[in-house]
Design a protein with these regions (language model features):
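Extracytoplasmic
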Residues: 23-57, 247-253, 376-380
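Conserved MFS/SLC helix-loop-helix module at the cytosolic interface between two early adjacent transmembrane helices
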Residues: 73-112
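Cytoplasmic helix-loop-helix junction between adjacent transmembrane helices
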Residues: 117-156
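Juxtamembrane intracellular "pre-TM" segments in multi-pass secondary transporters
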Residues: 8-17, 201-234
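Helix-loop-helix hairpin linking two adjacent transmembrane segments in secondary transporters
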Residues: 151-202
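Extracytoplasmic gate region of multi-pass secondary transporters
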Residues: 42-43, 228-285, 373-381
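Paired small-residue
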Residues: 97, 101, 112-120, 326-334
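Helix-breaking motifs and short loop linkers at transmembrane-helix boundaries and internal kinks
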Residues: 54, 86, 107-113, 124, ...
Length: 424
């Protein structure tokens, strides 16, 4: 039995009509769009922030990773809150901190201020994906859950797309500080829409959820931590999924400028291409996932077959280094696109547990992913600085860091293959 088939435990009485489901999806998608824009904007702003605050590679990695550090801090309490109070109340409360974080970043006058604001932003938007996925677990059927997950990620890619050339174009007009003020305003508007259209959470649902009758839910993560399926998915979530996002949202830009020799404007165009490719890829996953499930092709098999393509691309990029030249954006795009199959692990983990545990299961796995993003983002920066300290040229230091990341990702895939696939 795969994780997808376990989704039939969903509470049918809570299903939304098609029209209501679309409206709710769009409201959550708007908030997630802005959260992804906030996440990815440091890749475009990295040359400006590096010059203005005299940042090195380690500082830049820590600054970008601060978002994910703040995100990780909230995941375990977030899961309990989602299961208890529902997506609407939780996401509105959390987004208040995101607005404050954007304003704090706009007025920061030191690296410490920037880092604190990024952590606050990360904490604030940390419910923007988990809240809707928890709601979809109850409101949508199994096929729509797979599709909506992919299309939420597509919306995130659209936000990352907006963080590239559009931000580059607005920089000479507004400056980066005004951009963050505007982001805070737009997130507040998304909060208003969520307040208006997202349904409240029904807490008295044990009549519809057979699992809730026999399990005395104490709000703990005990069932999650005991799940062999969860632990099977953990290393690939940490290294491959986390690494994909770390590269997409930070190190893609420096790879193009520091390794391939591109200008900041050329790198912004490259980031636009990368995120456009990611957007199209997640849209296609949303179209294909229900059909693949109906054909009996489980998520686990897709990951086992598909993820090795990313290792080939990582090895090629690390080997070619500066010689990739004008093909740098295409190479990084291939790396990110070939890694997207691992994103299917997240809804699979959520559907491997009964609905009353969905918020905790999804948040626990999201903690794994975002801890991976933080570690990979900062770790690559540390490796680059270590390589420079060893006397390597900057491109060679980046090549060494990417190769180390590739080895870690490959080992996580081997663990996934060898771990006995016991379901929750």
């Amino acid at each position: 039995m795969t994780a997808v088939t376990l989704a039939h435990n969903t509470m049918h009485s809570d299903r939304l009509s098609r029209r209501s489901a679309v409206v709710v999806f769009l409201a959550f998608a708007l908030a997630y769009f802005f959260s992804a824009l906030v996440r990815a904007i440091t890749a475009t702003l990295s040359p400006t922030l590096t010059d203005e605050f005299s940042l090195n590679a380690q500082d830049l990695g820590l600054l970008a990773g601060g978002y994910f550090l703040g995100f990780s801090f909230t995941q375990l309490p977030l899961g309990r809150l989602l299961d208890s109070h529902g997506p609407k109340k939780v996401v509105l409360a959390f987004l208040t901190f995101a607005v404050l974080g954007c304003l704090a970043f706009a007025w920061a006058d030191s690296f410490t201020g920037l880092l604190a604001a990024r952590v606050l932003c990360g904490m604030g938007v940390s419910a923007c994906l988990m809240a809707p996925l928890t709601g979809y677990r109850r409101w949508f059927d199994a096929n729509d859950q797979l599709r909506s997950n992919s299309w939420m990620l597509m919306t995130g890619s659209l936000g990352m797309l907006a963080a590239t050339l559009p931000v580059q174009w607005l920089m000479p007009i507004w400056g980066w500080r005004a951009l963050f003020v505007m982001l805070g305003i737009m997130i507040a508007l998304a909060m208003v829409l969520i307040f208006m259209v997202v349904p409240l959470w029904r807490t008295t649902s044990t009549n519809e959820d057979p699992a809730a009758k026999v399990i005395q839910d104490d709000g703990s993560y005990r069932e999650i931590w005991r799940s062999a399926y969860f632990w099977r998915m953990t290393p690939i979530g940490f290294f491959s999924y986390g690494g994909m996002v770390a590269i997409q949202t930070l190190w893609a830009g420096p790879w193009m400028t520091q390794v391939a020799g591109w200008t900041p404007t050329e790198a912004a165009k490259g980031l636009f291409l990368i995120n456009l490719c990611m957007l199209v890829t997640f849209w296609l996953w949303g179209l294909m996932s229900p059909g693949l499930a109906r054909r009996g092709i489980p998520v686990e098999r897709l990951i086992a077959w598909g993820l090795p393509m990313s290792f080939v691309v990582i090895a090629s990029l690390a080997w070619m280094g500066p010689s990739i030249g004008t093909g740098a954006a295409v190479g990084v795009a291939l790396l990110c696109v070939s890694s997207t199959v691992v994103a299917l692990a997240q809804p699979a983990v959520g559907m491997a547990f009964p609905p009353h545990l969905a918020g905790r299961a999804l948040s626990a796995y999201n903690l794994v992913v975002f801890a991976g993003i933080f570690v990979v983002q900062w770790g690559i920066g540390l490796m680059v600085d270590a390589g420079l300290g060893m006397g390597l040229q900057k491109p060679a230091a980046y090549q060494m860091a990417l190769a180390c990341f590739g080895v870690c990702s490959g080992l996580s895939w081997v663990y996934f293959l060898l771990k006995r696939p016991i379901q929750a």
